[in-house]
Amino acid sequence: MVKKISIIDAKDHVDEEVKIGVWLTDKRSSGKISFLQLRDGSAFFQGVVVKSQVSEEVFQLAKDVKQESSMWITGVIHEDTRSHFGYEIEVSNIELIGDSSEYPITPKEHGIEFLLDHRHLWLRSKRPFAIMKIRNEIIRATYEFFNQEGFMKMDPPILTGSAPEGTTELFHIEYFDNDAYLTQSGQLYAEAGAMAFGKVFTFGPVFRAEKSKTRRHLTEFWMIEPEMAFMEQDESLEVQEKYVAYLVQNVIDHCAYELKLLDRDIDQLKKYTQTPYPRISYDKAVEMLQAADFDIKWGDDFGAPDETYLSDQFEQPVFILNYPKAIKPFYMKPHPTRDDVYLCADLLAPEGYGEIIGGSERETDFDKLEAEIKSMGLDIEEYQWYLDLRRYGSVPHSGFGLGLERAITWICGIDHLREAIPFPRMINRIKP
């Protein structure tokens, strides 16, 4: 009986006859030979159908079969050094499973809006396939890393009655007779978890009602948010760089084929596995921008062009330390020797990709935190549970948040966050 395999396992069956369930992505013919481009969800490779070596019925089917038709193919695996994948199948038999009508995403060029309108089908193509495989590896490596480091996974609520950074960018919903919001961060709940379990991380969707159309913004995206008790900011930075380097190394180790499909320079990625990452102060970053004739003054937040320029100046990710208090959230701990900045940092990815992590040591003093909440104009009653964490055995603790799609965009070397998530949600897109 012929063995049934996946395309990805072809390397283990060279010169063997196998059977594979596939979809047709493209084809061409030279008259006596048909070349079928095939996929099965694990990889892409080529099927070669030689007229003199198959029945007339099989060769005619190879000529007539339509793009995205599904079929069983039987044949012998051979090496193919010309392809990214490295193997092909010499087809001896084809059994049609499901015919396809006129498939809308043809091999020709299509505009991005057309492709996003057909995202449910575009996912089948090589580029999104490679990106989603790398996304999956980053998710797998995230769980592995934090498990190895002694963290517990904790699931914060998606519906919340309070907002960690104010309510200006929150999606409001009616919650029976009350107001509620879709979460924009699991951090406050992760802090509660850290006081119970020591080291926790959250990993889930968050929502930002930002009316932005830039390549770096989505309204729905995924965040990894670790929180660590008895840990100061410098120690947190070490965890952050170790985690990012771990993600990059695992993508290199497990997604070489997908990186080749994206033409991503693996040697470039290897540089990002070397730690520690460089660190500069916010003050120094402003000086660098001013020296490059950027219109910025101390106290301004960095925009995308600023972060792009700064990250371009380093061959590795770089930490920007100690931002002004006026441009960061209320829960951060002030610097011990400066009242105007926080013990915080953003990690900027190189190659112009900008911020992928934001983090800080958290304020532990009850009175100071209460005063900060009031100064923000937030309802203090909504935060009594959060203040309880300072009432009962407060300890130094730190945390950070990594935007999954931003990390994917950088590691894959792509231009826009919309390609880093299966079904992107943006200001002008909520379908399919």
From Swiss-Prot:
<dbReference type="GO" id="GO:0005524">
    <property type="term" value="F:ATP binding"/>
</dbReference>
<comment type="similarity">
    <text>Belongs to the class-II aminoacyl-tRNA synthetase family.</text>
</comment>
<keyword id="KW-0030">Aminoacyl-tRNA synthetase</keyword>
<dbReference type="InterPro" id="IPR002312">
    <property type="entry name" value="Asp/Asn-tRNA-synth_IIb"/>
</dbReference>
<dbReference type="InterPro" id="IPR004364">
    <property type="entry name" value="Aa-tRNA-synt_II"/>
</dbReference>
<dbReference type="InterPro" id="IPR004522">
    <property type="entry name" value="Asn-tRNA-ligase"/>
</dbReference>
<dbReference type="GO" id="GO:0006421">
    <property type="term" value="P:asparaginyl-tRNA aminoacylation"/>
</dbReference>
<dbReference type="GO" id="GO:0016740">
    <property type="term" value="F:transferase activity"/>
</dbReference>
<dbReference type="GO" id="GO:0140096">
    <property type="term" value="F:catalytic activity, acting on a protein"/>
</dbReference>
<keyword id="KW-0547">Nucleotide-binding</keyword>
<dbReference type="Pfam" id="PF00152">
    <property type="entry name" value="tRNA-synt_2"/>
</dbReference>
<dbReference type="GO" id="GO:0003676">
    <property type="term" value="F:nucleic acid binding"/>
</dbReference>
<dbReference type="Pfam" id="PF01336">
    <property type="entry name" value="tRNA_anti-codon"/>
</dbReference>
<dbReference type="InterPro" id="IPR012340">
    <property type="entry name" value="NA-bd_OB-fold"/>
</dbReference>
<dbReference type="InterPro" id="IPR004365">
    <property type="entry name" value="NA-bd_OB_tRNA"/>
</dbReference>
<dbReference type="InterPro" id="IPR045864">
    <property type="entry name" value="aa-tRNA-synth_II/BPL/LPL"/>
</dbReference>
<keyword id="KW-0436">Ligase</keyword>
<keyword id="KW-0963">Cytoplasm</keyword>
<keyword id="KW-0067">ATP-binding</keyword>
<dbReference type="GO" id="GO:0005737">
    <property type="term" value="C:cytoplasm"/>
</dbReference>
<dbReference type="InterPro" id="IPR006195">
    <property type="entry name" value="aa-tRNA-synth_II"/>
</dbReference>
<dbReference type="GO" id="GO:0004816">
    <property type="term" value="F:asparagine-tRNA ligase activity"/>
</dbReference>
<keyword id="KW-0648">Protein biosynthesis</keyword>
<comment type="subunit">
    <text>Homodimer.</text>
</comment>
<protein>
    <recommendedName>
        <fullName>Asparagine--tRNA ligase</fullName>
        <ecNumber>6.1.1.22</ecNumber>
    </recommendedName>
</protein>
